């Protein structure tokens, strides 16, 4: 048997939800629903809940809209938090080599957090530095993606940063500045790199 951890929330509340689901021979069974209070209720955003998670041994890193919490699996208690004044509408989060890679949707950035020091390296998706990745002269407009509203983030086996894009309805290799695949019929919502392959979902229900 295997277990699945699902993050969520409620449109009319500020709490987050971590649901443990067990896959059995008879189907999927909900083991527990665990409500997680926002670490700072005074800045909690209604309807966001927990927008992204990354498992780290006996813990899970969980993104609220504007703060990241480390939650212990044994009792679902928050044991640590990461704060930054530029955290704004955080979405998916992934863990790679003791670093958290965060899709900071509202700030239009990729935030890379060194867990040993809590230092944050920020890739500004609207800044000049990232724009330098574009070819100076290129007739193919498809090579110059405009970066707006990232929904998800993952790291491939070559350590490229892969982003799901809402407005473009596509997947972007940010490191190489290349589109992956074609434009889809609805926005890309979640992207994962698993066993050498990119898996993703769209708002319209494509997997």
Residue ranges and their predicted role:
Residues 6-16, 21-22, 61-65, 102-107, ...:
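Conserved beta-strand positions in repeat-built beta-propeller and related beta-rich domains
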Residues 10-40, 62-76:
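Beta-propeller domains
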Residues 32-46, 82-86, 120-148, 179:
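Surface-exposed loop and turn segments in beta-propeller and other repeat-based domains
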